[in-house]
Amino acid sequence: NLSKESVTVKEVAELCKKNNPNVKLEATKDEVPNLGYTLSNKKLLKTGFKFLYNLDFSIKEMIQNWISNENIENLEFIRAGEKEFIDERGKISNYELPESINLVGYIESKKNTIRANHFHPVQEQKVLSVKGQFISIYKDLLNTNSNKITHVANEGDLIITKPNVAHAMVFTKDSIILNLVRGEREHKNYGITHTMKHVLVNEDEKKLLINSYKFECRCCGNNKLKRIISLGYQPLANNLLNNKNQNCEMYPLEMNYCSNCHNCQLSVIVDPKKMFSNYMYVSSTTKTSREHFIGAAKKYIKEFKLKPKKSYIIDVGSNDGIALKPFKDLNFKKILGIEPAKNLAKLANKNKIKTFNGFLEKESLKKIKKNANIILASNVFAHSDKLKEMAQCIFGLLHKNGVIIIEIQYLLNTLKDLTFDNIYHEHYNYWSLTSLINFFNQFDATIFKAEKINTHGGSLRIFIKKGKKNKIEKSVKILLKEEEDFGIKNFKTYQDFAKKIYKIRKNVKKNISNLEKKNGKIIGYGSPAKATTALNFFNVSDEISCIIEDNKLKHGKFVPGVKIPIVSKNKLKNKKNTILVLAWNFFEEIKINNKNISNKFINIKDLEQ
């Protein structure tokens, strides 16, 4: 739709530069194939047809459209074969290509090797995986805020990568791939080679990916997992830095969905010893958490007729003993915590709450007294890669008439309320009641009761007994129907969630920038794991001068990735501070308790619109 008869490449380039000063122009010495391309048609003009836009306006409009849209979708995507025909001879799969090809490259790759580490300025890359498996890593080079994203290509997958997307392949099995090419290997007319080197994955990252990637569902074993969302490469959320220049390992933070059992899990497994050997999250820090477990203890004592001298209570992942302390205060004698973090187990034992320091696994089972009447596990089933082993151990410790009470951050709340910042590497799994029932069905056990609770921005509490003959309360059926109606079994529900989260990132970046321009430097409040996830995903660093934290163990540390210092609120002298509350689930408590340091508190959730 151009009003000019002919135009040269140089003219188009200069108009692009005019409308977007960030464009870099590079002249080449290549032979120009012709002096200009005819873009209009005289015969067409004679019919009375008129061009609406001139070239300058058209380019400006395109650039504005590109700027307003975050190019997240379809930078690289995987397509399975369609219209399959299967008989006794085998299988035929068909792949419809968006464009014709004129060259096929046959490539063999050994396990534990890297290929690609490049991008194509002009062409799409299309690779068909014939045999084996590889992890594909890609990044949009046209968007400076883009994340590095990974996904898995299995046999029979067609992987399509867009131009100007850097990509690499880490082979986890001996593999054969076909490279399907349109065009020549070089574009001499434009002075640009077909393939430009761009090292996206080095040897260290290759080893990290190979050692940590999770290819199958840990609940049912399905290896065809679907990507929900990528929050980019992120540091371990609670591994705070001792100084600003300290390096930290970065791992993909990506959630996958299993269409077989509806489990959601991360794409990688980080060695738990790296996260839990010296754990910074102390549950008793907030009054809200303490009151929650006091109320829970009183509820369980009444509901299950627990006796102070007889009833035996175990808490798995007991932290500093927060869930057992109310029982101790009510004179319960037989209580035991199981906690892998040395510092927290030591703290609990110091406070006279008997705590076993270690992971709950087969090796440690023989060291722990059995026949518990109640076994508590608060946010523990999110923290284990060895779910089946842990579940077997819990059932092994339980009295035949005992009850397991599990609290988990509720996936339905995460999806509804867009609380993506509850996603971090400690949380291997993200549970719905639907997926929990599918999981515990494997152990001849019954979830007989379920209830929503308010912790962590929305959680679920379930009650489990051994055997299949237990009466199931209405609460289970009601919540299952709510999940079904919401679309917990429909992958589109998860795709819609991801789209909304990418939009939130754009809004928060804009609103924090406006807030800083209006009020100067911003001070954060609270450095929970969710703050690490959010700040790194938003790429917010210099905009926040420091973060106040009530947990003394964190003072003098830095948030990994964004490297924002964590300080005591005693450091603040000016009541005119703008406080951005990152621990948004404790917003009201923080606001009420800190009127002396500021009269302006903003919940980070309010910046998402």
Predicted regions and their residues:
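C-terminal substrate-binding subdomain of Rossmann-fold SDR/epimerase-dehydratase oxidoreductases
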Residues: 1-77
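A short, N-terminal "cap"/entry segment at the start of jelly-roll beta-barrel domains
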Residues: 71-103, 116
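Double-stranded beta-helix
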Residues: 78, 170-208
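Short acidic-glycine-tyrosine-enriched beta hairpin
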Residues: 141-163
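N-terminal juxtadomain amphipathic helix
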Residues: 210-288, 451
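A short glycine-rich, Lys/Arg-flanked "PGG" loop and its adjoining helix->strand segment in the class I
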Residues: 388-403
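Conserved beta-strand signature within the Rossmann-like core of class I S-adenosyl-L-methionine
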Residues: 401-409, 602-603
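Short, glycine-/aromatic-enriched active-site segment of Class I SAM-dependent methyltransferases
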Residues: 406-429, 433-435, 440
